Structures are given as C-alpha cells and as structure tokens.
C-alpha cells in the first residue's frame, strides 16, 4: 500500500472529499493541516502554488482537489465500473463541486483564510451570494432528477454502491445547509441520499470523530 500525505489548511473545504474517500476506503494517510501562518513560506513549493496537494510515497505530487478525488476514487473502488459510469460519477461530482466552490467564494479571503462571519461583507458579497443562489437553482433540480433516474433515487447515485458522487453530495452541501436549513426542502431524494451517506458503516464513525472546523 502506498503512503499518502494530504496537504491542506485546517478546514474541511476543498480537501474534505479526499478525506471522506480515505475514510470510506479505510485507508490510513497523513492528514497534514497547514496553518495559515505557514502557508506564505510553503506556497512556492506547491504545484501551482495551491492546496490541497496529495503526496504519494514522498515522490509523486497531485494538486487540484477533484484530480486527487478522482485518483483516490479509482484506486479505492469508488468511481464507476466503466467509462459511461465514470462519466456519470464525474458530472454529478462536478455539479456539486460548483455549488461548493461558489459557496466558498462568499467567505474566502486569501492564503487559506476564511471569513467566518455570515454573511461576510467583502465589498462584493451580494454579487457572490447571488451567484451561489443561481448555481443552486440551476443544479439542485437537475441533481434531484438525475438521482431519480437510478432506482427511483432510493439508493446511491450509481445504485447500491456508494461512490465519490454521493460523498460530494454530502460534503458540498454541508455548510450551505448550516446557513439555510431549508435548502433541500424541495429535493427529498437528495436529503435522503445525504442521510444514507451519514449512516454508512464507514462514514458514520468518521463524521462523528473528525476534526470540527467552521468550513
């Protein structure tokens, strides 16, 4: 088994999908959480000067959260079984990533610093919030319909096996639901899917014991 080190700030943020994949697979890794004060000195050492970044066997470096997530999903069996299934897992995951990305941009400052006040007035917060709300209006109905296409939406996104797509549904909506508890009130299939992820035999212990952060 390779050795893994996941580098990211002490947030769930863009690295949480990767942490959830490690938990779902039961694979050990070094969860290196970088303090914002350390980041300035480290930034130029990182590929693309960004995190998260996954190190494998202290030799290979993979930047970009979704590239890391797809790699781990393929390695651990949480991607599709064929190209068509992989495409479905990918587009569902990317749709939820769009929601998470627009949400984080409302609160993101720079160099890993997040503004925890809700809403955070950074001079253009109204524009960013409008963009996030429009993204939700565009994507959530589509995700509900997409889920219903598989077994009536009563299992996971790909059927009876949990995949990266289901984990993205959970982690991408975690903070938005904290801000607006009724966000999924019109999407019962998505609500139920998040419940299945939460009660999964590998995910339930992880979600109860993980480091508690605001984002």
Curated annotation (Swiss-Prot):
Domain GST N-terminal: 2-80
Gene3D superfamilies listed in its UniProt record: 1.20.1050.10, Glutaredoxin
Gene Ontology biological process terms in this record: glutathione metabolic process
Domain GST C-terminal: 82-215
Pfam family of the protein (one): GST_N
CDD domains: GST_C_Sigma_like (cd03192), GST_N_Sigma_like (cd03039)
Tissue/organ expression: Lens.
One annotated GO molecular function: glutathione transferase activity
Keywords (A to Z) from UniProt: Eye lens protein
PROSITE patterns: GST_CTER (PS50405), GST_NTER (PS50404)
Superkingdom: Eukaryota
InterPro entries: Glutathione-S-Trfase_C-like, Glutathione-S-Trfase_C_sf, Glutathione_S-Trfase, Glutathione_S-Trfase_N, GST_C, GST_superfamily, S-crystallin, Thioredoxin-like_sf
Family: Belongs to the GST superfamily.
Described purpose of this protein according to its UniProt entry: S-crystallins are structural components of squids and octopi eye lens. Contains relatively little if any GST activity.
The protein's name in its UniProt record: S-crystallin 1
Organism: Enteroctopus dofleini
Source lineage: Eukaryota, Metazoa, Spiralia, Lophotrochozoa, Mollusca
């Amino acid at each position: 088994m390779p050795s893994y080190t996941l580098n990211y700030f002490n947030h769930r943020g863009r690295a949480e999908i990767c942490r959830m994949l490690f938990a779902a697979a039961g694979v050990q890794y070094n969860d290196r959480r970088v303090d914002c004060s350390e980041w300035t000195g480290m930034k130029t050492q990182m590929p693309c000067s960004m995190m998260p970044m996954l190190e494998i066997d202290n030799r290979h470096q993979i930047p970009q959260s979704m590239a890391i997530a797809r790699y781990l999903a393929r390695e651990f069996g949480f991607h599709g079984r064929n190209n068509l299934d992989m495409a479905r897992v990918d587009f569902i995951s990317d749709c939820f990533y769009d929601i998470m990305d627009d949400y984080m941009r409302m609160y993101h400052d720079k160099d890993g610093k997040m503004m925890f006040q809700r809403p955070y007035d950074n001079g253009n917060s109204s524009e960013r919030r409008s963009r996030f709300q429009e993204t939700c209006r565009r994507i959530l109905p589509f995700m509900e319909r997409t889920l219903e296409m598989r077994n009536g939406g009563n299992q996971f996104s790909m059927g009876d096996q949990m995949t990266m797509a289901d984990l993205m549904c959970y982690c991408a909506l975690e903070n938005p639901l904290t801000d607006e508890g009724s966000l999924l009130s019109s999407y019962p299939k998505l609500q139920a899917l998040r419940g299945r992820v939460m009660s999964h035999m590998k995910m339930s212990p992880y979600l109860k014991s993980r480091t508690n952060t605001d984002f």
